[in-house]
């Protein structure tokens, strides 16, 4: 049964937030480079949600492509330890809004409040690696894994978020994106050659931070970051140096004095041996020698939670055919409308709530208008005329549960404080 929804406009941190009346109790929870995130209540199901506004997604082809990539990934990647897309809509101002589950806090904020007990370090690392096993099996690299991109609720359920920078598993990459503290050395040294192992390095840095309560490699800049990595791991081996493409970087690395590695058992003297062994296998200079997410899950340190029957891989590889395309904004707009329409046609993945009839008509009309506009512009590229179709939406909801749970009142109370 279709429902009628209207858009309500409000100001949040000086930013116009334009959402349907299905969502109430809007409160800001975070601001990123590409959008604003607010908490809200989904009145249709009576549950809290997070709403991320992508501001001016069609202002440039680069931003349109990035938004399209994030939407495609959120639709494709469906796993208990990954943030789940519950709704998506376009406002009359043509901003795009992603609606996901609302988690109580993130790991960065949690680590600032208190040290974590051993069982929480184990359980959180297990869930991170469980999610990465799935992501990597889909042919995807997260590329920006860090504590602030790891969300946690009061049941200690963990979800990895922010796939806007994720990329294909391609041996030829350009640029580096991850936050410095969690950046793998091959990104700093080669820039163009890296794979899923960069996520394992980031997870290892996060693992150490959960153990010690502070970043393992808090570099002040690019040079200092590399220097403190070599303080622990020693000088990079020859097979790493041979991959350096930049002449300046090569000169810098080869000019450094030789450093011997520090045994992990010596660096982490008070940490249990199994934890030190797993950390040592994650933080390896040579990417292909790092432990994989799948192998890490069977390590003795994670034995309390490891379940080979409940650590799924992706059913299909993610389709990256669009990723190398250099398309105009209006083509990305057409593709975006198609993806949004498809999301609502399949009920957000489970079809539990059928409120899509009105949305189908409205977005289909907008899609048809965009298609007509795109066709017109391909016929008359010199005209420079643009139209801005608008639309509203109904929505669908998906419910996700995690079968594993542990509790400790002290930590749960800390997480709850972030939600009140």
UniProtKB/Swiss-Prot annotation:
InterPro entries, per database record: Kinase-like_dom_sf, MAP_kinase, MAP_kinase_CS, MAPK_Sty1/Hog1, Prot_kinase_dom, Protein_kinase_ATP_BS, Ser/Thr_kinase_AS
Parts of the chain that traverse the membrane: none
GO MF terms held by the record: ATP binding; MAP kinase activity; protein serine kinase activity
Binding site for ATP: 29-37, 52
Pfam families, A to Z: Pkinase
UniProt keywords, alphabetically: Activator, ATP-binding, Cytoplasm, Kinase, Nucleotide-binding, Nucleus, Phosphoprotein, Serine/threonine-protein kinase, Transcription, Transcription regulation, Transferase
GO biological process, one term: stress-activated MAPK cascade
Coiled-coil ranges per UniProt: none
Cofactor(s) essential for the protein: Mg(2+)
EC number(s) reported in the record: 2.7.11.24
SUPFAM superfamilies from the UniProt entry: Protein kinase-like (PK-like) (SSF56112)
Subcellular location: Cytoplasm; Nucleus
Free-text description of this protein's post-translational modifications in UniProt: Dually phosphorylated on Thr-174 and Tyr-176, which activates the enzyme.
One GO term describing the cellular component: nucleus
Enzymatic reactions: L-seryl-[protein] + ATP = O-phospho-L-seryl-[protein] + ADP + H(+); L-threonyl-[protein] + ATP = O-phospho-L-threonyl-[protein] + ADP + H(+)
Residue numbers bearing the Phosphothreonine modification: 174
Phosphotyrosine, modified sites: 176
Name of the top EC class for this enzyme: transferase
Span list, region Disordered: 372-394
Catalytic site: 144 (proton acceptor)
Regulation: Activated by tyrosine and threonine phosphorylation.
Principal subcellular localisation of the protein: cytoplasm
Family the UniProt entry places it in: Belongs to the protein kinase superfamily. Ser/Thr protein kinase family. MAP kinase subfamily. HOG1 sub-subfamily.
General function of this protein: Mitogen-activated protein kinase involved in a signal transduction pathway that is activated by changes in the osmolarity of the extracellular environment. Controls osmotic regulation of transcription of target genes.
Written domain comment of the UniProt record: The TXY motif contains the threonine and tyrosine residues whose phosphorylation activates the MAP kinases.
Name of the protein in question: Mitogen-activated protein kinase HOG2
Organism encoding this protein: Zygosaccharomyces rouxii
């Amino acid at each position: 049964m279709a429902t009628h929804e209207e858009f309500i406009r409000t100001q949040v941190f000086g930013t116009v937030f334009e959402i349907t009346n299905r969502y109430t109790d809007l409160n800001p929870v975070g601001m990123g480079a590409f959008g604003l995130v607010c908490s809200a209540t989904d009145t249709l199901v009576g549950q809290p949600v997070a709403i991320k506004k992508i501001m001016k997604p069609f202002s440039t082809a680069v931003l349109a492509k990035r938004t399209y990539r994030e939407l495609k990934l959120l639709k494709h990647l469906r796993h208990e330890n990954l943030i789940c897309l519950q709704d998506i809509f376009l406002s009359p101002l043509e901003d795009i809004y992603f609606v996901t589950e609302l988690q109580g806090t993130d790991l960065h904020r949690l680590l600032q409040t208190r040290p974590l007990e051993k069982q929480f370090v184990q359980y959180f690392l297990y869930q991170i690696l469980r999610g990465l096993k799935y992501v990597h099996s889909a042919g995807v690299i997260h590329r920006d894994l860090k504590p602030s991109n790891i969300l946690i609720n009061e049941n200690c359920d963990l979800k990895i978020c922010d796939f806007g920078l994720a990329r294909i598993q391609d041996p030829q990459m350009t640029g580096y994106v991850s936050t410095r503290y969690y950046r793998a050395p091959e990104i700093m040294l080669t820039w163009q050659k890296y794979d899923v192992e960069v996520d394992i390095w980031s997870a290892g840095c996060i693992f150490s931070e959960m153990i010690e309560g502070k970043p393992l490699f808090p570099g002040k800049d690019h040079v200092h970051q590399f220097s403190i990595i070599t303080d622990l791991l020693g000088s990079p081996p020859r097979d790493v140096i041979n991959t350096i493409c930049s002449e300046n970087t090569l000169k810098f690395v080869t000019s450094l004095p030789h450093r011997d590695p520090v045994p992990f058992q010596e660096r982490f003297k008070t940490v249990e041996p199994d934890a030190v062994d797993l950390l040592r296998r994650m933080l390896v200079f040579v990417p292909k020698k790092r432990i994989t997410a799948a192998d890490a899950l069977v390590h003795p340190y994670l034995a309390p939670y490891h379940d080979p029957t409940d650590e799924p891989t992706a059913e299909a590889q993610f389709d990256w055919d669009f990723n190398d395309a250099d398309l105009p904004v209006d083509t990305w707009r057409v593709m975006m409308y198609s993806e949004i329409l498809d999301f609502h046609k399949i009920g957000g993945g489970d079809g539990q709530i059928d409120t899509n009839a009105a949305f189908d008509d409205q977005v289909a009309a907008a899609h048809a208008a965009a298609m007509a506009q795109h066709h017109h512009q391909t016929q008359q590229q010199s005209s420079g005329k643009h139209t801005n179709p608008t639309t509203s939406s109904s929505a669908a909801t998906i419910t996700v549960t995690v079968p594993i749970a542990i509790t400790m009142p002290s930590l749960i109370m800390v997480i709850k404080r972030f939600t009140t």
